[in-house]
Amino acid sequence: MNEQQRLASQQVNSSTKKEEKDYSKYFESVYQPPSLKEAKKRGKEEVKIERDFGLPEEFRNFGTGRKFYIRTYGCQMNEHDTEVMAGIFTALGYEPTFSTEDADVVLLNTCAIRENAENKVFGELGHLKALKRRNPDLLIGVCGCMSQEESVVNKIMQKNQHVDMVFGTHNIHRLPYILKDAMFSKETVVEVWSKEGDVIENLPKVRRGDIKAWVNIMYGCDKFCTYCIVPYTRGKERSRRPEDIIQEIRHLAANGYKEITLLGQNVNAYGKDFEDIEYGLGDLMDELRKVDIARIRFTTSHPRDFDDHLIEVLGKGGNLVEHIHLPVQSGSTEMLKIMARKYSREHYLELVRKIKEAIPNAVLTTDIIVGFPNETDEQFEETMSLYREVGFDTAFTFIYSPREGTPAAKMKDNVPMEVKKERLQRLNALVNKLAIEKNDRYKGQIVEVLVDGESKNNPEVLAGYTRTNKLVNFVAPKSLIGQLVKVKVTDAKTWSLNGELVEEPIEVE
């Protein structure tokens, strides 16, 4: 959005909040509702790379003496966006707080993937209304994926007028300007860009810890699965340059980080938008094998883009872990076609075969949707049989949630909710059964564990994760937090392992 558009939007919002407003005029200037037809045209738009994020003089000490609070919903990408916003707040002079009561600014970084996630946000906005009454100077903001939906922003502006600012996923780097506008405006400041943003490098970050780190390698998704809102809320696929990614990871390694997770809505489409070089995720992973860091993993991958070169590189091992999250969504080819996943059951099983052949100790996890419109009993049984055939270690399972603006939301659905819930229960029973069977096989084995910190259930116990993302609890000195250690597994549960410390710490070669 350019300056002319911004001025136009401010003129549209010039009336008081108590007056009736024609919100459609506002959205004409800054926002476009989800449109499959229009979204698919976007590939022709140029994406620029901005390498220098800097704060103008007017923002020096802007937040001195003030505190911020960010509540994050949803995926790892949102977690990383929160780290960036925390970095910007800190650069402005704000201090973090863990209580909304102490905050001068409260941001809700939202998720739009399912209706339940949106309901949680509106519930929290209701709680914040009372806080705003007690503290009128408090600034409340809504950002993230929900902000990219026109219906959501309309609801906020009509029914949650205590919200001071709304901004989307493409203009996080403009947070200082949005804060300033919200601070001095009597109106709700809304800055939602329908065009996806450019790639902004060197944004400040306040990472949640000093052991593991998220690193974005790309943004957006061009797959347009019929049920998914992400291509609309996150924009088209845009890859960061490999040299920028490698430099960031080398810097993290030099600062003592032990594990990196490469992030992207469709991470293995990385590089497909490059016009000057042929370079994909397999090439990037091959270069990252040479970086002196203990572990590198990635999420989330799409089976359609999981190529043989990537499998070959992952098979080389080293710091590339053996855990692969590979969402299948359904085991029925007919359902997959309606979902527009662009692969079949047979293609997925062949991909799994190739992965297991190249990486014999690979651990696979997945995502599955049950109760997609008109899913038959036979199609659901195909999902159950595929789960058994692949032998997943675990899965994230969901009942289909319609998202406004997606093709699936317009489909007639003859599957009663009671049937959907029963299918989910049956699937979860299978997931739990296989999870404990898989974990039982670790009994007596010695595994490498990266120690995250104290167990959530017992501060006297340490907790960490294996290379295959298994949670391990064991008793050991707290001085080992952040270290790689050897643990012998003594007991297996559905979602975790218990063990005894064998050796500490492990030197990374």
Curated annotation (Swiss-Prot):
Disulfide bond recorded as keyword: no
Main subcellular location: cytoplasm
Chain sites annotated for binding [4Fe-4S] cluster 1: C75, C111, C145
Residue ranges of every copy of the MTTase N-terminal domain listed in the record: 66-184
Domain Radical SAM core: 207-437
Classification via InterPro entries: Elp3/MiaA/NifB-like_rSAM, Methylthiotransferase, Methylthiotransferase_CS, Methylthiotransferase_N, Methylthiotransferase_N_sf, MiaB_methiolase, rSAM, rSAM_horseshoe
Organism: Bacillus cereus (strain ZK / E33L)
Residue stretches of biased makeup (Polar residues): 1-15
UniProt-recorded name of the protein: tRNA-2-methylthio-N(6)-dimethylallyladenosine synthase
GO cellular component, one term: cytosol
